[in-house]
Amino acid sequence: MPAAGDDRPAPLPADVPSVAGSRVAIVVRSGAPQSELRIGQLGADRKNADYHALLVLNAVLGGQFVSRINMNLREQRVYTYGARTTFDFRRGRGPFLLQTSVQTQVTAAAVRESFREFEAIRESRPATAEEVELARASLTRGFPRSFETSEQVVRAVAQLALYDLPDDSFEQFVPRVNAVADSEVTRVARTYLQPPDMITVIVGDPDVVSPAMQAEGFPEPQIVTVE
């Protein structure tokens, strides 16, 4: 860490290598009527050249109410009250994460459907022009309101310094998001979403969830007991 008064930027955090191979962990909550579900992997850093395309991808996949994963798990299958995905952009590579809470008996099915959506947006059902247009609009429509207060402006300036971004990053946000093409969304989905290497963490009842996960073809879960 730089000494006090030293205005040199702090060194970037060490890059964490991606984990190869899918893994499942169940944190024991015996008798739980619901499971807390997280599925994720390493994503991208804030300065990544694909930042804007990844925002659009996330909006299509799980970043808004009408996104694919929420429509599947909530609207079609009624497994949950809501499901969402996020890319957590940091100085180093932050996580990509799906999060939701589902009924215990449908936990494995919810995991299965989530992975199907990951695979579909990569290959069999890439983002459509209509989905991409809606995603771009959701990201840009209210963007000017992010700078209405002094606190918001200070926070924005802090981001420029923290992530070492160009001074015109926020001015360029809307045009760069609007320039994201359907093909770019497919490209970044194939590049940054790697379902075979994703980690699944479930907080729930292992007696119900573990055999159901294995019946769906997932690897045998690691059972984690928290005192």
Which ranges hold each PLM region?
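Small-residue-rich helix-loop
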Residues: 133-140, 144
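Structural motif
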Residues: 202-205
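Acidic/histidine-rich, surface-exposed loop or edge segments in extracytoplasmic proteins
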Residues: 37, 167-170
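Non-catalytic beta-strand/loop surface segments
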Residues: 3-48, 59-110, 131, 152-156, ...
